[in-house]
Amino acid sequence: VEEDIRAYVIWGLGSFARVSGNQMTLFVILMTILIPLSFLLIKTMNLMLLGDSYARNLGLNIKRARLLVITSAGVLTAIVTAYCGPIIFLGLAVPHLCRAIFQTSDHRILMPAVLFAGAALALICNLIARMPGFEGALPVNSVTALVGAPVVASVLFRKRKNELNE
């Protein structure tokens, strides 16, 4: 029971350390199937950027498209969270960072960029959390918060500034 509580607390703080080889095999299989399926939604998401009326005029079923995008994002997020815990700020900060770096809203560019940038940032944060010299390891969330919080704050302040200027 004590080990289960410890495992739950570590999972709740976000950790890659408790994922076993068998779990990783299942994770890779699921991601190998689901990520390419999410790439099939790129055109749909680009159409949704145009607004509902334009997208509808171009033949997009808005309700169905939203359901597919939300379901796809939800399932992928749920799988990652089930394995690694809620690693906060990666999912919020990385898309905004990529949008700022590549200066585009085109999902043909953003989807692969976010995929690779998110993986790279997760690995870097995990390495920093396990830096030699620490007693044990910091939760990955403590490092992702240092990166993600300023990004999310800048997005919120920029949006607020734009609203005030209008």
Model-derived features: positions:
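Alpha-helical transmembrane segments in inner-membrane proteins
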Residues: 1-166
